[in-house]
Each structure stands twice: as C-alpha cells, then as structure tokens.
C-alpha cells in the first residue's frame, strides 16, 4: 500500500498435503506475521536573519502531521540549524519535549527508533513560532513538506525572514494656489 515499504521476504505457509488424490484439511502450524513498515523520513533547516544571514539560535518550529494532527516542536541550535534526524539528536533523548535544540522528536505510535526517520509518510505543516530571538522579525509563512521516500532527509535550506518595517513619519507642504510642493519666491 501507499506509504509502506515493500516486504521482500518470501513467507512460506504450509497449507496441506495431498494423499491418494485428495487433500487433507488446511492446518497452519506456525502462524506467520507479516509486518508492514511505514516509510519514514526527516527534514533539516538553517535559520538566519535576512540581509546579514546571521544564524539564529533557539528559534522554534512546530511540525504538524496533516493526516493525524500530531504536532511537535524542534528548536534551532546555536548555529541556527535544526533537524528531526536521529543523526542530529537521537529520537530517544527527551522525546518530543521541544524545550531545547537537543530534544529528540518522533511521530506516531510505538517506541522511537534511532535507525528510522522521525516523520512517517505523509504531509506536514511547518510553522515558525514567535519567540524572544525572532520578535524583531516577521515570521516566515507556514509551508507544507511531504515525506514520500524511506530515510530521505528533506533539506529545507536556509530560511530567512525580514525585519519588521520601521514606521516613518513625515510632512509635506503644498502651495494652496498652485497645488505644488514649491513655494513662491
């Protein structure tokens, strides 16, 4: 089925034997359990200030499964980098706490597995969350990402956001008779 890895193991099941032209009743001596493995992947990103590209630390990003609504937070490290991969920070360390850049992340049921991706097959919404370290900037718009391949790391690249525009105040005088901005001499 879509979203699962193909089981390439051949499972042999003894269904009965033929004796004198007739088959004996079906008996299964050892039940066979065939487990389907859900495709899993990861994502990574770099967060930087627009114009200067200064790396931004401790910026939270919420990742939400569009299929289940399950949601967890990852934070950028001191170099502005973040990843859901166990190679970055094991899934099994402070799983889904979302309090530091070193907390692991895992979506779905079951025990976190550091040999697999954190995100099961599907579409995810990625949102930058407001915090002290990005309060002077406009948050990037939320965007979707799709996990479709086993163990693929989706590189979101460097995400930047603009500073809030600085309000400007000014005056402009117009000549009442001519309507121009030039005064009479």
Task: Label each region the model flagged.
Residues 1-185:
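Solvent-exposed loop/turn and edge beta-strand elements of beta-rich ligand-binding domains
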